[in-house]
Each structure stands twice: as C-alpha cells, then as structure tokens.
Amino acid sequence: MSRRRSLTFTRRATLRLGAFGAAGAALAATGLSGARAQAEAPGAAFGPARHGLSVFGDLQLPADFSHFPYVNPDAPKGGAMRLVPPQWGYNQNPQTFNTFNTFILAGDAAPMMETCFDTLMVRQLEEPDAVYGLVAESVSVSDDEKVFAFHLRPEARFHDGAPLTAEDVAFSLETLRTKGHPTLRQILSWIDSVTVEDPETVVVAMKAAASNRLPPTVASMPILSKAYYETHDFQRSSLDVPLSSGPYTVGRYETGRFVEYQRVADWWGKDLPVSRGHANFDVVRVEFFRDRQIAFQALTKGTLNFREEFTSKTWATEYNFPAVEDGRVVKAEFPDNLPAGAQGWFINLRREKFADPRTRQALGLAFDFQWTNTNLFYGAYERTSSYFENSEMKAEGMPSAAELALLEPLRGQVSETVFGEAWTPPVSSGSGTDRDLLRRANDLLLEAGWTRDGRRLVDAQGRPFTIEFLDNSPAFERVVQPYARNLERL
C-alpha cells in the first residue's frame, strides 16, 4: 500500500505538525517529514485509511461501491434546467445578484455557486451522518479522532488544468476560517490547525472540545485555488468568475436577471463513484424574481421548467393552468425522507415574562393548529412535534433503555417529563376557539403568577402581559391574526 493511502504518524508528531505557535511554525519551515517525526516520537499510529467518514458508526457503502444507491448511473446528459432556487445560503440572494463571490458576507451572490466548487468529500443523502471521498481518495484518523489526514487524488484539477493540491486545501480552510462568511468562520473556528504534509496529503487537527460532527462538515468545505487568490482579493465582492474545479462553471449571465451554470464536459471527477448519476444537465439556469407570484407565472409561461412549491394555497388552487391540464407540467409530491425543518414562532426567553414554562405552555394551547391547517393551509401541513422531525432522532413514546442510560445521570437536573412519554402538541376541536384548551391555558397562566385586572392579564407589578410578533413575511399575518384573537380571549 502506498504511503499516500496509509499515513502513519505518531500522535505526538501529528500534534506537533498541527500546533499553534512557534513549534508548528518551525516544523512547517524546516519541512520535518512524517518519517522523521515518527522516529523521534514513537507512539500510537493513525488507523487504516478510510473511504469516507461517519459520525455515528460504520459507513453504509463499501470501499468498492460503484455509485450512490439513489441515482441512475446511466442517466443521460444534456438539456437545461430552469428554476428559481428553492434554497440558498451564505450571502446568496434568490431575488437578485451582484457578485459571484459566495463565501463572504459582502454582496448578493448568485444561488448555486457552490456547484462550481469541489470538496474533499461529499454527502450520501441516505446517510445523514456520512461523507465519501471526492477530492480526497481516503482519510486516516488518529486514535482520539481529533486529527484527520486527507489523501488527495492526484488527478484532481482546476478548470484551467492546474493540479488541485494539499496547498489549495490548506489555503481554503485557513481563508474561510479567517476571512469567510460568518457562518463559515463559526464552523471552522473549531479547527486547531491545518498542515500540508506533501502535495497530496493535508492534515487537519480539531480542537479537543470540537463536536464529532465537525469532521464531515470540514470535509464538505469548498476548495479554492490558492494561485487564483494570490492575484485576486478574496474579500472583494465581484462579478469576476472565480477559478474552481467542480462539475459546473459560470456561463452566460445578466446581473440581477439570470445566471447559467454550464456543465464542465471534461470535469476531472465525472467518473468517480460519488459523481456518477449527478450533474446531468448541460445547463442549470437560475432565474431571479422579486415577487413570488411573478415567479409562479414564469412557470405557467414556460420560462421555468422546475419549481418547488412552498405555499399551500398556491399548491391547492393555482396549479390548474393549461400546461398542467395537458401534461406538459407534472404536479407531484415526493417524500424526501430527510429531517424536516420547523416553522413557527420562537419565544424570546430573554424576556422575563416568558420565563415560567407554564406561561409558554399556555401560549401553545392558544394556537389552534387544526383550524389553521384546514382554513388557511388547505390541509397540507402536518404538526411538528420535534426539532428532529422526520428523523431517527425524534423522541417517540417512552425513553428506550439506551436513552435512559444517557438520561439517568441527569435525573433531578432536568424536568421529570423527560423520563416520561415524548411531548406531543395539543389537538383542538378545530373550531378556532377550543374552550377546553383555552380554559387549560387560563389555568396555567394563573398558576404562573399572572392575575386579572378587569379584562387585562397583569404580573405581580401590575404590568400588562403584551406580546410582540416578529415575522419575516407579511404572508403570515393571516396566521397571526386568529392566534392573536385567541390570546386576547385569555
């Protein structure tokens, strides 16, 4: 087995290579080899090279897997996808754009720019805790699982043909950690050090308190070209197309109107197991609209050929245009089997009036989800009862023996309800003013120390109980108003 696949540092040598301060700088300056370090500091070696990383256990796919199980490895290439992106991150804006630098705070970047960049490893969507090698052919992990040596594929290339090396990976992590978008800086602040061992090996050491979920996240960070940013300011918001190495690159665009991502036909990684069946469209065109309804009209006119719908009223009442009727547009629901997000109001616990949990429970009882779902959401919603909805981590029923083993040391420090049935939200009569639930809410408020002063609910100092709602869209006013009327009844 080649050295690139089975790096065998001692723990002491590895920590020295990755330490902050003069010791780490001296090692980098002298180019102390792994062999010399190992000879000077005998000790535990790295484990065998792995083809991926998993947070909770073994990898689902073997080292010789041919493709991810949910893709068609023989999917035809070609065509164009035209859409409004259903999700975005960093400084991306779905309504307009003025920069292609998506990894900083400044500017409004075009969504989907990340498709232009390769990463060390990529996620396998049927394993939410696992990543498999893309630029990194394999990874070796220290015994304490805090130091990771990524072994790069020698064939990895940027779009200009230049090799993608460990220097680029180290530069990327350091740059994103110190100059990147605040989200990236926060994540990468848990890295202790990044060290280039040789052109095809980069060693990343995590801080002792870092979560075991960090390594797959670090392995999913975009890889930048060090050479490119030696002549370009990383922190500058610009429409210069950055040099990258991924399956797509920026093609035609009009600022604020559209951007086309062009498939790179000779992308170096197109035949890897993690890539087969992906990046099938020749062109992915992102369209920009400042109004949701205008974006929907673009679908009806054929400007878009894909749309993910987030508005239940539109889904229930407006997908009846001719292209749907004659089958040119297919309306379908797909179970995604992924952890669901949460939508709701989050109570500001820094406000003293919300400190008592009985007060918060009362607020929950006053919201009639069943009425709201029937009358406002067209029956399309299901009530969220966990931050881990639609995942194996959602609490259901009584704690299992394994869960109790984790919980018992905390008995007396957490609520006893933790040891009973998992919480489920109240179910109303659907009338909009369920008297039983409102009566229970009133009782809880009185138990929490609130009293009646005529029609007002006041605290011990006579201050009225007021609530301010902050929403990110005026569309939710129709949801707030019935809820507010129920709160006024209390």
Q: What are the residue ranges of the model-derived segments?
A:
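Gly/Pro-rich hinge or "lid" segments in bacterial periplasmic/extracellular proteins
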Residues: A106-E127, E174, V218-R285, R290-Q297, ...
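Extracellular/periplasmic solute-recognition and catalytic clefts
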Residues: S193-V196, G251-Q262, E287-R351, R358-A362, ...
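Short, well-ordered beta-strand elements
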Residues: G79-Q87, F148-A149, G246-Y248, V259-E260, ...
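Surface-exposed binding/hinge segments that line
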Residues: H151, R185-E230, S245-E254, G397-Q413
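Append "and occasionally in soluble cytosolic enzymes with long acidic Gly/Pro-rich linkers
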Residues: A355-R485, R489
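N-terminal secretory signal peptides
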Residues: M1-A13, L17-T30
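Aromatic- and charge-enriched surface segment that lines or borders ligand/interaction sites
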Residues: V71, A75, T96, F103-D108, ...
